[in-house]
Structure formats: structure tokens, C-alpha cells
Amino acid sequence: MSLEAIRYDEKNHTLTILDQLRLPHESEYVPINNSDDGWKAIKDMVVRGAPAIAIVAILSLAVELVHGGKVSRDQTRAEVGSFISDRLDYLNTSRPTAVNLSDAVGSFKKLVQTQTGSASELIEAFLSASHKMLLDDVQDNKNIGKYGLEWIQKNVPQAANGHKISALTICNTGSLATAGYGTALGIIRALHEAGVLERVYALETRPYNQGSRLTAYELVHDGIPATLVTDSMAAALLRKNKDIGVIIVGADRVVLNGDTANKIGTFQLSILANHFDRKFIVAAPTTSIDVQTKSGEDIEIEERPAIELTQVKGVDANKQPLTVSVAAPGIEVWNPAFDYAPYKLIDAIVTEKGVAEKTGGEFNLKEFKSAN
């Protein structure tokens, strides 16, 4: 059974999330009581992963509409609609790179604008749509796993010849980054379930260590054969291990031409895949495809605090929280959270609707998205 990082009680409208800052040493669920809690959880990376961020943001507002005390079904529809729209705009400021959040905000603002009826009916419509968003994400991820498995079995030589393959991945793209199952890690789960996976190699993903803290946690939990490596070992690993047939990454934003923003380090993996002639695929829901942004150069890249690079958090021998400084005091730091893989180095983009591939060396994601 895969992990459940988001727990939403539809009947009582309560939300708790697994505190990912405490993983892998502690598994603690924290309550999200309103949109302020949601914003802080996203900003502080208590929850992370583009799909999960959007889901927690919307559900945090759903909880607030029921329990927050700032809005009432006795108010006018205009007052409730204005409150929801203002809170959505606020939530959208928590993390700017992930398109899922801005898309969800836009979708729910449209619901506010188009839903007719009373304030109570508007609140009910919001609650229903937010719960559906949670349920749909799990099924979407399983579909991504299915389509990714099929593509790999046809296009990765070892798998096409009936042999097991190994895969390389970065960051965390599993149940901890989504409503469940995962995107890139969902494909890896599908490979494992089908008996196709020999081993997955997970990059530690500095400086926040989502690979060593979160992906490794999921892989151990699910009993998937896995090996953890540092980010700087990727080239040596690919040169040594010929059985690694595919690199699978997630996406925070896929733009019109196919350039894909993802965790810092993704760009170098796309270069390595090209150099070593390995397949490089992106796993993302269609909600992560942003056809309004033309290329990777137009993506706003979030920069994180310097302290995330100069200090490391963990626990001591007694499992007490511990923060250790690992850099020379006074050193300047550049700490972008993301980079982007250019579309020319991407073999396929796997979504819940199917697989987008290049024709004549170009992706046509506008047509792909509209057709699906």
C-alpha cells in the first residue's frame, strides 16, 4: 500500500497532511485549518510537489469555508465569492513555479464567476469540486503509470526485448508529491508491479534532499529495489550501469514547446541521457502543461533561502532534531529551486491522457492538450 500524504475527511471537512520536513525519521500528520495554514505549509515545504501543492491549497480553503468563521452561508453570494477569490489569489503567491497551483486557482475562480445560486450553493459547489480534484489526481497518476509502462516497453530497447531495466529519477514525485501513487514514481511503481523493473536509482536531490528523505522513504516503504546516489554521481552511474535504460522525471511546469521546469538538476540529467543514449521522459498531468508560456526562458524560477544550502537538518543518535552548518560562514549562495530540460532532449511527455511525442523534432502540446 502506497503512502497517503493528504488526508481529507469529506464528511467533516477536515484536512491533515504528512509533515514532510520530519521525514524520514518521523511520520507526523499536521492539521490544516484554513488558507493561512495552507499557504504556510506550501511555502515552508511541509507539503511539496506540484500536484500536492495545488490540492492542499484548494482543500485548505474548503476547510476554511466550513470552519474558518470568516464567511457564512447567511452572507450574500457576492460577499462569499469575493472572499473565495481573494483567498485564492493569496494562496497563489505561496510558490510561483508550479503551474498546477495557478491553474487550480484559475479554475476555482472561474467556478466562483459562473456558479449561479445562493452563497450556500456556491460553498457547496466549491466543496464538491475540491474533493473531486483530490480523487481525480489519484486516478490520473495511475493512468500516467500505465501509459509510461506501455511506452517504456515499446521504446526502451532492453524492455522491448523482454529484459528487466533499471531507471534513474530525481526529487520526489510519488505519493508524497501528489494525492497518491505519483507521476514519475508512479511509472516506476507500474514498472515494478509489472515485473519489468530491476532497480531504481534515486538522486539525493540537494540541497533539500527530497530524494534521500522522501523518495527513499517511499521506495523502502513499498519494497521497491532501490539505490540512493548523490547528484554528482549521475554521470559515473550511467557510464557504469548499462542496464539503466530510462531517466524518468516529474514536472512543475511544461511549457508550449515542451521545455520542462523541474527540480534543480533535471537539466543536467537530460544532457546525460542524450550523451549516453538513454531515454529521457517527463511524467506530468495535463494540468502541468502551460501552453500560455512559450519556452523555458519565460518560466519564473523560484530561488530558495541560502540557509537551505549552508545548513543540513537531520536527527542525532537519540533521534532529536539537529541542524548542522556545512559551509564557510559568509560565503555567497545561489539556490534556485528549479531548472528546465530543453524539449530537444526530451523523448516523451507522459500524461494521464496519453503520451506526447515529437513530430519532426517538435512537440505540439497545444494540439495534444486540446485533443485530450
UniProtKB/Swiss-Prot annotation:
Signal peptide segment: none
This protein's UniProt keywords: Amino-acid biosynthesis, Cytoplasm, Isomerase, Methionine biosynthesis, Nucleus
UniProt keyword annotation of Isomerase present: yes
UniProt xrefs under InterPro entries: IF-2B-related (IPR000649), IF-M1Pi (IPR005251), IF_2B-like_C (IPR042529), Initiation_fac_2B_a/b/d (IPR011559), M1Pi_N (IPR027363), NagB/RpiA_transferase-like (IPR037171)
Site note Transition state stabilizer, residues: 171
Gene Ontology CC terms, in alphabetical order: cytoplasm; nucleus
Enzyme class: isomerase
GO biological process, one term: L-methionine salvage from methylthioadenosine
List of catalytic residues: 252
Compartments (UniProt record): Cytoplasm; Nucleus
EC number: 5.3.1.23
The protein's annotated pathway: Amino-acid biosynthesis; L-methionine biosynthesis via salvage pathway; L-methionine from S-methyl-5-thio-alpha-D-ribose 1-phosphate: step 1/6
NCBIfam families: eIF-2B_rel, PRK05720.1, salvage_mtnA
Function, in words: Catalyzes the interconversion of methylthioribose-1-phosphate (MTR-1-P) into methylthioribulose-1-phosphate (MTRu-1-P).
PANTHER family for the chain: METHYLTHIORIBOSE-1-PHOSPHATE ISOMERASE
Name the record gives this protein: Methylthioribose-1-phosphate isomerase
Natural source organism: Yarrowia lipolytica (strain CLIB 122 / E 150) (Yeast)
